[in-house]
């Protein structure tokens, strides 16, 4: 299911993020299943309660590792510099993604319905990483992180997650939404990395957010598959 918009008020984005929706191009969408080559998987939307977020040794170590880099936050405008960096990133990844940043965010157009910002990470003058996020009134949604593969030892994707969380903390926002994880598909588990203890997971049936735990996700995945199987049986009987 998706929603098309012309301009998005901040409180509108807050509401729909809280209902398990997310940005795709210039629309909002939600889903409970993800079909992949290896099978059908359940999706589980996440958010971090900013006020409860704390860092452990791994997160603090990453801040120290990258402290020589400069960081700036700007309103998003698509530039050749961003596209060049995204192209380098795109060539280095082993999963499906949009071939350009403009295609991913603007779907080939120029109008943006979202209040979008970008975090830049530079080594001197060189842009080495960038993280795009949308702002609501009380929350942000992380849309994409991309980085120079030459700096892979600096874990810049995870670093950008921490920087987005710190941006939300600086502006006293309630939530940072990093997207969904996929049950039994560890490639998405990095979204828990910033602070599992502050992470909540969405339950579409009750429209509730609960503290994250793998036990809860396992039960929710089993329930979703059971409901899907029952629905398929009903359709076959008709």
Show which residues each predicted segment covers.
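Acyl-donor binding region in acyl/amide transferases
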Residues: 1-18, 103-106, 113-116, 127-199
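A short, terminal or domain-edge coil/loop segment
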Residues: 80-87, 154-155, 227-238
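A generic secondary-structure boundary signal that marks alpha-helix termini
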Residues: 25, 95, 169-170, 200
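Short, surface-exposed, polar/charged, turn-prone segments marking secondary-structure boundaries
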Residues: 98-101, 113, 160-162, 168-173, ...
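Terminal substrate-recognition subdomain of acyl/acetyltransferases
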Residues: 1-68, 178-238
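A conserved beta-strand-loop-helix scaffold within acyl/acetyltransferase catalytic domains
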Residues: 27-36, 51-153
């Amino acid at each position: 299911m998706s929603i098309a918009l012309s301009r998005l008020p901040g409180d509108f984005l807050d509401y729909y993020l809280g209902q398990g929706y997310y940005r795709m191009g210039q629309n909002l969408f939600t889903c409970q299943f993800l079909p992949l080559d290896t099978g059908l998987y359940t999706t589980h939307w996440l958010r971090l309660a900013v006020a409860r977020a704390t860092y452990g040794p791994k997160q603090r170590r990453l801040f120290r590792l990258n402290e020589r880099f400069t960081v700036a936050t700007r309103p998003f405008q698509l530039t050749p510099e961003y596209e060049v960096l995204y192209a380098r990133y795109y060539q280095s990844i082993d999963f499906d993604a949009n071939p350009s940043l403009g295609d991913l965010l603007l779907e080939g157009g120029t109008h943006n319905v979202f209040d979008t910002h970008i975090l830049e990470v530079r080594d001197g003058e060189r842009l080495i990483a960038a993280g795009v996020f949308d702002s609501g009134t009380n929350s942000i949604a992380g849309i994409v992180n991309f980085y120079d593969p030459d700096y892979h030892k600096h874990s810049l994707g995870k670093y950008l997650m921490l920087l987005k969380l710190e941006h939300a903390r600086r502006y006293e926002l309630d939530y940072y939404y990093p997207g969904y994880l996929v049950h039994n598909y560890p490639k998405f588990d990095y979204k828990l990395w910033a602070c599992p203890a502050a992470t909540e997971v969405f339950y579409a049936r009750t429209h509730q957010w609960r503290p994250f735990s793998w036990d809860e996700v396992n039960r929710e995945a089993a329930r979703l598959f059971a409901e899907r199987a029952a629905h398929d049986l009903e359709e076959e009987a008709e």
